[in-house]
Each structure stands twice: as structure tokens, then as C-alpha cells.
Amino acid sequence: MKESIFSKKRILLLGSGELGKELVIESKRLGLEVIAIDRYEKAPAMQVADYSRVIEMGDKNILKNVIKEFKPDYVVPEIEALSIEALKELEDEGFNIVPNARTVEITMNRDKIRDLASKDLKIKTAKFDYIFEFDDLEKKADEIGFPLLLKPLMSSSGKGQSLVETKNDLQNAWKQAQANSRGKVKGVIIEEFINFDFEFTLLTVRKENGENIFCLPIGHLQSNGDYQCSWQPLEIKESLIIEAKRMTSRILNNLNGAGLYGVEFFIKGSEVIFSELSPRPHDTGMVTLVSQNINEFELHLRAFLNLPIPRIDLIEPSATRVILSNQEYLNPIYEGLYEALEFEKTKVLIFGKPVSRKGRRMGVVLSSNTDINLARKNADEAALKIKVSTT
């Protein structure tokens, strides 16, 4: 008989942002104990966790010590900026890293996941190369062709990503990528710009027995690589979804760790082009909080806890739109909440970040409707009602 009592299971969350906050909430519903770790105080997930700690997660010894102190049953990374050496050593010592240390390492570095997909598994991607010195950039840019994309090898939420139109833009794009690179890696990936028709996320649950379960595709729009809105379901040809599932299965069969994965694709004509993969709940997947009978955070938990995952159903077509700050505030407040909640079947999530910055994601609006276009319209208009401010 499978173990069914989880009240004494302990999860240590590495990174405590808005996605981590929702994961903690779902963990508490299952009776789990959660420790939330981040590099700053009062991070969103810390506000709902049992315990929290502020540390430098990129320091191997500090990270190992705090994990050994709390002795969690599961170590669950939510971000890329952490010491992979610590996780690999702890896994060798018997700690359970979700989904596993190898997958965390491959997906936190754009070069490793791109090499796995393109070179090892022969999956179609944009043309790309890696540059570690600015002097090599101009020559490689001529080979790739303009416009092109320049990204840090390690970053999150699109930070440091630039669309480079001409040679004159290379210097500034290089500086931007260097300034926003996480960890010790200072190289960049130079990438062909694909004038795609649309992009989407395929949330995929990998079970311990190796089965892959797919959610309905999620459409999304980005600005400078950062998610702005999403909607589910996305209208897309069945043949394209079949190919995306095939590509996803090939990658996950190689990574082979239980959990939820956010897999991003471009569509150009009849081509399916692999973009990126995250081994954890995905920002575009926040729409599943209202669109699905089992949201992405609960799916992640069920997968790595080896709990049953029944059929994933669409409750109703739904959409999201982020709430952005236009400047820096300490202890920000939110105006227009009343007006935003006047929209039918609409919810507002305020993440609770202690400091706002220009362009920082501070919350999200979720809206449902039998008409997906109306759900998107309501989410967009409700988000415009909310202004981040200060007293």
C-alpha cells in the first residue's frame, strides 16, 4: 500500500518568489512543512512558509550547511541562481533534489540545455553559438545575421536579453548581458532571431514511472524575454501539438526526473522549434490556478511526492495579465483593486514583494470566460486598473 500520510514530510524551497509562494500554499494544503530560502527578507514564499532563512545560495558551503541543518525530505529549487556543486554533493550524500541535480544543472545553463536538445537529441532549435569575449561577437553576429538575440548563459525572467538590430547595438547588448548574468558564468548565447507566428508553453508532468502527462497548450506573449500575459487553451493545429509532445518526451526521457516542466516552443508555419525548458512551475502556467482542475503547483508536488495524478481537465478558458511597477517603492501599495475585481470571474494575486522596481512583476490578474478572447480582454483591462504606488 502506498504511503498516504505526508504531515511529517519537509520541503526546503530554494528561491521564494511568487511561484514559490503558490507552491508553499499547495504544500500546506497537503500538510507538508516548508522552509523558504532566498537572498532577501520577506520574499513572497517566506510569508506563507513555516520557516525561512536569508542566505547567499550561490555559496556552496553556506547552501550545504543550511540544507543539512533543516534535513528536508525534498530540496526544491525555484530559481537558477544557486550552487549546483552543493546540490550535486548533497544528492550524492542521499538528499532528494527535485527533479534531480543533473536536470537542475542542465536547465540553469542555456548552453547545456541547448546542446542537449540540438546536438545530442537533434531537436530543432534556432541557430546559436556561445561567445565569451566581445572581440569574437562581431564576427559571429555576421554569421548568424541581423536581427539576432543576445542572452546571458545564465539568467531568469528574460533579464539581460536583447534584440540586436545592427552591429552598432552589439556593445550595449553585450554589457546588458554581462550585467544581468547570474552565477560565475559570464558568457553569452548569440541566437538567430526567429520571426515566429506565435510561441507557447507545454506544461508537462513527469511521473516517477517515466510517464509524461501533458496539459493543454498555453499561449503567451513576452517583452524582452519576460512573460506579460498567458491564456489556456491555445488554438493550435493538432499536428503541431503532436510534434511538440514528441520533442518534449525525448528531452524528459533524457533528464528523467519526476516533477512538472514548463517547455517553451516557437511555431513558424508548420515548424515546431524548441526554445527553453524549466524543471519547475512556469510563470505562464499561473493561468492554471483558475483554468485547470489541478493547477501546476499541485501537479509538481504530486509528481515528486509520487501521489496519484488523475485526468487533468480544463475548468474554463482563462487568461492572465501581469501587474508591473513603473518605479521603485519600499513597501508598495496597490490602487485600483476594487475596480479590477468588478470584472466577472476575475481574481487578483498580489505577490507581496517588499520592494518594487521599474518593470518588476508585482502581481497578476486571472480571468475566466467561456470565450477565451473575452477572458483575455478582461484580464488585460483589469490589470490596467491596478497601479503600484506608495503612501
Curated annotation (Swiss-Prot):
GO molecular function per UniProt: ATP binding; magnesium ion binding; phosphoribosylglycinamide formyltransferase 2 activity; phosphoribosylglycinamide formyltransferase activity
Residues annotated as transmembrane: none
Binding site for ATP: R110, K151, S156, S157, G158, K159, G160, Q161, E191, E192, F193, I194, E199
Gene3D superfamilies assigned: 3.40.50.20, ATP-grasp fold, A domain (3.30.1490.20), ATP-grasp fold, B domain (3.30.470.20)
Residues the entry annotates as binding Mg(2+): E264, E276
GO-annotated cellular components: cytosol
GO BP of this protein: 'de novo' IMP biosynthetic process
Sequence ranges assigned to domain ATP-grasp in this UniProt record: 115-305
Catalytic activity: N(1)-(5-phospho-beta-D-ribosyl)glycinamide + formate + ATP = N(2)-formyl-N(1)-(5-phospho-beta-D-ribosyl)glycinamide + ADP + phosphate + H(+)
EC numbers on record: 6.3.1.21
Keyword Cytoplasm listed: no
Binding site for N(1)-(5-phospho-beta-D-ribosyl)glycinamide: E18, L19, E78, D283, K353, R360, R361
Xref: InterPro entries: ATP-grasp, ATP-grasp_carboxylate-amine, ATP_grasp_subdomain_1, PreATP-grasp_dom_sf, PurT, PurT/PurK_preATP-grasp, PurT_C, Rudment_hybrid_motif
Keywords, alphabetical: ATP-binding, Ligase, Magnesium, Metal-binding, Nucleotide-binding, Purine biosynthesis
Pathway as given in its UniProt record: Purine metabolism; IMP biosynthesis via de novo pathway; N(2)-formyl-N(1)-(5-phospho-D-ribosyl)glycinamide from N(1)-(5-phospho-D-ribosyl)glycinamide (formate route): step 1/1
Family: Belongs to the PurK/PurT family.
Function: Involved in the de novo purine biosynthesis. Catalyzes the transfer of formate to 5-phospho-ribosyl-glycinamide (GAR), producing 5-phospho-ribosyl-N-formylglycinamide (FGAR). Formate is provided by PurU via hydrolysis of 10-formyl-tetrahydrofolate.
Subunit structure: Homodimer.
HAMAP family recorded: PurT
Name of the protein in question: Formate-dependent phosphoribosylglycinamide formyltransferase
